Amino acid sequence: MKIPLFFNNTARSARVGRFRRWLDRHRDFFDVIEPESREDMLNHLVSQANSGAPAVAVAGGDGTLGIAARALCNTETVLAPFPAGTMNVFSREIGIRPDFDHALHILNTGRSKNVDLFAFNGQVFLQMAGIGADARAVELTTWEMKKKWKALAYVIAGARVCTEKQPHLTLRSEE
């Protein structure tokens, strides 16, 4: 039985090209689904979970995996990440190296673990949500920067945030 593999065909990470070449050699394992949008991916993943799929593979970065987490939370369907993004923080944190063969090996062993998710204003988050300077640095990090500088792009954006006028808040208390 082929595993449904969701591939973010709009992702522009340098790893996406490598993943496509890797996938060409491993298509026998997967039923590849390339949704047209984030909403389309979410709907397809929910449909897979509702139909009782035991597992779905998702190739992409942290943003793509976040969409998958929203769709699959509180279901019995296992998420099998294939790290194809720039940073792949979540995959690294759960022990999946940025190596597609390693991700396939883990999928084939059936090894899984439960992870805690959190929600804010009804939005499910897989690993973190940032505010302030952290969120601004992510906002300033463009695809072009990630392509040229890879992980260093976030450091560069963070430095830019430090040069911006910072908001000021004063709290007063009776004490």
Residue locations for each model-derived region?
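ATP/NTP phosphate-donor binding region
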Residues: 1-56, 66, 70, 74, ...
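Catalytic core of DAGKc-family lipid kinases
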Residues: 4-7, 74-78, 82-174
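Glycine-rich nucleotide phosphate-binding loop and flanking beta-alpha elements
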Residues: 13, 63-65, 88, 132
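N-terminal glycine-rich "phosphate-gripper" loop used for MgATP/nucleotide binding
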Residues: 58-62
